[in-house]
């Protein structure tokens, strides 16, 4: 599948590795930086979703998304592990759940940019969760220099998903290097992070913004045990 991720915000918190590991299945290990696991609240706008060489899918090919993710190792692969992905379209949510085994959710989702402000919100309707909402508003700053942490959090070339018959699912993710900017929080409600089974994050987050990148996601395969 090809797509374009636009106006993406990377909002991350440190967690103790064992707190995140207990939410992962056998065969999937939390990846760490500076001794910590990292969990992100990541809003963006998905545009141009479709198949290579064809026109983008009408209606279902463009929508806002807010996901909660961490970083893992499985076999000899390193990638993103999605704890939830909220969108406002039923069809792509169901297709992704079946085809890629990743936990898409459906509800009212908003993601807009006005000048240097980026604002996102989630009110989840399906499946139900104790904490079903999130709000995030940031002000975009100057271009940010690349460093080891920003590369750890953003330079990920695959996704790992729920095992099938005991083997984790892997799909390659290809995109250019991110153009990253500093960003400051104006408003934050991380309820969907708590809904994933984690303690509510109270520490100051690490925040970055990018105008976006074109993305190609390959077909899912099963990793060897």
Give residue ranges: language-model regions.
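Internal, well-folded beta-alpha domain core
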Residues: 8, 67-225
């Amino acid at each position: 599948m090809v797509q374009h991720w636009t106006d993406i915000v990377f909002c991350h918190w440190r967690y103790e590795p064992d707190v995140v590991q207990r939410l992962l299945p056998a065969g999937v290990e939390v990846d760490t930086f500076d001794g910590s696991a990292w969990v992100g609240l990541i809003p963006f706008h998905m545009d141009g979703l479709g198949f290579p060489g064809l026109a983008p899918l009408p209606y279902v090919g463009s929508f806002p998304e807010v996901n909660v993710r961490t970083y893992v190792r499985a076999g000899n692969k390193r990638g993103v592990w999605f704890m939830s992905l909220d969108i406002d379209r039923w069809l792509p949510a169901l297709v992704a759940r079946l085809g890629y085994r990743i936990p898409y959710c459906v509800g009212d989702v908003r993601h807009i940019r006005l000048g240097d402000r980026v604002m996102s919100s989630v009110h989840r309707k399906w499946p139900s969760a104790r904490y079903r909402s999130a709000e995030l508003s940031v002000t975009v700053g100057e271009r940010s220099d690349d460093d080891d942490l920003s590369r750890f959090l953003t330079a990920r070339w695959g996704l790992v998903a729920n095992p099938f018959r005991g083997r984790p699912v892997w799909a390659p993710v290809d995109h250019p290097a991110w153009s990253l900017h500093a960003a400051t929080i104006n408003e934050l409600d991380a309820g969907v992070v708590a809904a994933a089974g984690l303690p509510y994050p109270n520490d100051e987050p690490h925040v970055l913004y990018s105008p976006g990148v074109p993305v190609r996601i390959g077909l899912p395969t099963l990793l060897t045990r």
